[in-house]
């Protein structure tokens, strides 16, 4: 996949991206929201061997990697997505909603009729972005999983249909 909007690029992750991905994934500050406050503890060799992987995407701003996205077909004409703007200086800039818009448009164009995702209940910044894009909150799962340290976590489930989609990449 390769999607471009001004200085923003979404592209398929390659084995050469493994060092950057591992740097982010092993950083507890980057991964805490996903339940890994100590990072994943993975290696460049292990991750390079998994790439390219269907649905694993790199986010670039002016050709500089700043984060990653993923998507997968979950059946019933739905795609599940995820995003991390990993470089903190690029957070809170409105880039996430543009990257999400680009991917969502592409997935709807591929015939998916619904996009689903979940996020940590404590991740209110992400919830705000998802709701601006038109996602509807469908469930809150209280204490439904434990993070890497054994702390109970809650999740919010969202769904989006083409009719509700607010495109920020126009």
Located regions from the model:
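Active-site acidic-Proline motif in GNAT/NAT acetyltransferases
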Residues: 87-93, 121-122
